[in-house]
Amino acid sequence: MTSIGIVSPQSMFFDTPLPLQSGAQITDYTLVYETYGTLNADHSNAVLVCHALNASHHVAGTYSEDAGTTGWWDNMVGPGKPLDTNKYFVIGVNNLGSCFGSTGPMHINPATGKQYGAHFPVVTVEDWVQSQARLADALGIKQFAAVMGGSLGGMQALAWSILFPERLRHCVVIASTPKLTAQNIAFDDVARQAILTDPDYHGGDFYAHGVVPKNGLRVARMLGHITYLSDDDMAAKFGRELRSGSYQFGFGIDFEIESYLRYQGDKFSTYFDANTYLLITKALDYFDPAKDFGGDLTKTLSNTRAKFLLVSFTTDWRFSPERSHEMVQALVNNNRTVTYAEIDAPHGHDAFLLDDQRYMNVVRSYFERAYEEIDGGSLKAGASA
């Protein structure tokens, strides 16, 4: 299997206001995206990949010969890979509110002539899906072969199946959940408080002060990273190993796990925007499509039309297998076609990004079967695309 190679992002400007769930609107905006593979003649082989918290439109390939610019899901997407770009036309979109190109807090607010900062409106998963649908319209894609995502990306895929049931044939939801638990909301709030109470945050207008709330971002990332790993994985990687071989009897770094978390926090604070972090964690917290159906997930999913693949990981305690079980049961209650795989993997929530061959084979097999609908299957025989 080879990489897609060097890729370039594209952008599309929208001058029609986007109404948001909050009641606010974004008057005009830009979406940055990348595409891989070739769109077929009837536009029936398009797959939308939705990204998680700190990822972006850069799903696969590289921006140069430097491997450090490799896309965040390059092991999943590419020629001969589970989502095979020799067969599928894959789209990665950067969500509104992000800091990787699409309109967000770092951009100029046309109403003020200044950067949005903390004044960028709160966006939800459903708002992102609405903006993605507009991009699909502009690209001439009436129906996706699949919408796919892991973690927060999986929430977007699920929302697609609810909001636009006729616009996707397959919905692939990996390491995700139909709503956050109180514990998950608590983690997000502590992370936000770390940023909001950093003196360099300046009420979200830190750009004008020429500073970055690095300490808040560092702590937020450290906390988040703990939730992405499993206890077993941390024990195997770090255990109680000491950085210098003995206790220092101070408040610096003694343990290797401390060194690792601080490294992750430091790195994150150099490239991620604090306002974006606040926005995206709020979008996570607010996602609860069953809320409008009295909490009944079966009713929530009753109008879906897609076939589903759900994947969970045994040691993922952020979005545990029980959350996937809830979605599977609700879909079964609605007589939907569901494939479910629970992968015994030690890597916690981050397992959805890693090269577990059992996991990769599940996804590969699913997309191979889905492609039969396009190449000589029901779509080629004349079914609507």
From Swiss-Prot:
Binding residues annotated for substrate, in chain numbering: 221, 350
Xref: Pfam families: Abhydrolase_1
GO biological process terms held by the UniProt record: homoserine metabolic process; methionine biosynthetic process
GO cellular component: cytoplasm
One GO MF term attached to the UniProt entry: homoserine O-succinyltransferase activity
Keyword tags: Acyltransferase, Amino-acid biosynthesis, Cytoplasm, Methionine biosynthesis, Transferase
Site (described: Important for acyl-CoA specificity): 318
Known pathway: Amino-acid biosynthesis; L-methionine biosynthesis via de novo pathway; O-succinyl-L-homoserine from L-homoserine: step 1/1
Stretches that traverse the bilayer: none
Catalytic activity: L-homoserine + succinyl-CoA = O-succinyl-L-homoserine + CoA
The keyword Cytoplasm belongs to this UniProt entry's keyword annotation: yes
Cellular localization per UniProt: Cytoplasm
Catalytic residues (positions): 151, 316, 349
EC number: 2.3.1.46
Main subcellular location: cytoplasm
Assembly information from the UniProt record: Homodimer.
Cited function: Transfers a succinyl group from succinyl-CoA to L-homoserine, forming succinyl-L-homoserine.
Family the entry assigns: Belongs to the AB hydrolase superfamily. MetX family.
Designated name of the protein: Homoserine O-succinyltransferase
Record organism: Janthinobacterium sp. (strain Marseille) (Minibacterium massiliensis)
